[in-house]
Each structure stands twice: as C-alpha cells, then as structure tokens.
Curated annotation (Swiss-Prot):
Pfam families cross-referenced by the UniProt entry: DUF520
Gene3D superfamilies: 3.30.70.860, YajQ-like, domain 2 (3.30.70.990)
A GO cellular component entry from the record: cytosol
Name of the molecule in the record: Nucleotide-binding protein SYNW1816
Entries under HAMAP family matching the protein: YajQ
Role played: Nucleotide-binding protein.
GO molecular function, one term: nucleotide binding
Length: 165
C-alpha cells in the first residue's frame, strides 16, 4: 500500500452529454410555437457554441431552454460563458457561447493558495490544467475535497475530482 494518497482537481465536462443536450434543445426549439419560425441555428464547435436566431427575444428563449436542458442532463451551467450578442445581416442575432474546460493558471494558483492556507498536512502541485493534492492520510484528502467543494462558487468554474488513490 502506498504511503501517500492523492487526487486531481480538474474542470471538465462530458462532451457527449453536451451533444445530447443540444439535440434536445434543437428539438424543443423546432416544436415550440413561439420559436418554430425563428430559423434558429445552434452549432457546436471545438471550444464554443454559436447560436443564430431571429431576435433578442428568441435568443433569450433559446438560452433559457439550453440552461434547462443542460441542468436536466447534469451539466454544470458554469461551463457556459455567454458572450454579448451581436447583430448579423437581415435582422438576425448571433451569440457565441464559450465552453470552459480546464483550469487556467490563475484559477489553479488561487485554488492551490486556498488549500495551502487552510490545510497544512497536504501538498498541492499545479499540473497543466489540473491540480494534484497529495497527503499522507485519506482523512486529510477528504478534508481537502470538502474545502474545495465549499470554495467552488468563488472560483466560478465547475470542479471534478479524479484519480483518487
């Protein structure tokens, strides 16, 4: 048995769940009476969504449907970074929604500082887009998990725990 235990804190989402969510949103938009004739398009790209629709009102309705469907499929709403809508030709509105994935250096440093200040028995190492927390006892790691969960709202990114060993 190893003398130390560790886990990784990451910020990720299930891409297939996002694809399924967007399929449900498209189906919902096609069936809703107020959105049926809006000619709404939702495109998924590698790091963002692009929503193109008829007006600001229909854009807001599509955003609400997207949030509701994502919540039902257990996707955190923190993965969506809604940019400001912009006008495109022919009275249409386009909005880019960035998808947050991975921990930025700034957030990783903030997270590591929080854990280091509160818990002295664990060590924190930033590894690219994740943070590894190592400790001698599993109880210390459980305390670290509880601490990170309690501070998740301050960090404004969805956090998951992986590789608990």
């Amino acid at each position: 048995m190893a003398s130390t235990s560790s886990f990784d804190v990451v910020s990720d989402f299930d891409r297939q769940e996002l694809v399924n969510t967007l399929d449900q949103v498209r189906r919902d938009v096609g069936n809703r009476y107020d959105l049926k004739d809006s000619n709404t398009e939702i495109q998924l790209e590698e790091t963002e969504l692009v929503i193109t629709t008829a007006s600001d009102m229909t854009l807001q309705a599509v955003e609400d449907v997207l949030r509701a469907k994502a919540t039902k499929r257990n996707l955190s709403l923190k993965i969506f970074d809604f940019q400001t809508p912009e006008s495109v030709g022919g009275n249409r509105v386009k909005q880019v929604v960035k998808l947050r994935k991975g921990l930025s250096q700034e957030i990783a440093k903030k997270l590591s500082k929080i854990v280091r200040d509160e818990l002295k028995k664990v060590t924190v190492a930033i590894q690219g887009e994740s943070v590894r927390i190592t400790g001698k006892s599993k109880d210390d790691l459980q305390a670290a998990i509880q601490l990170v969960k309690s501070k998740e709202d301050e960090l404004d990114v969805p956090l998951q725990f992986e590789n608990y060993r």
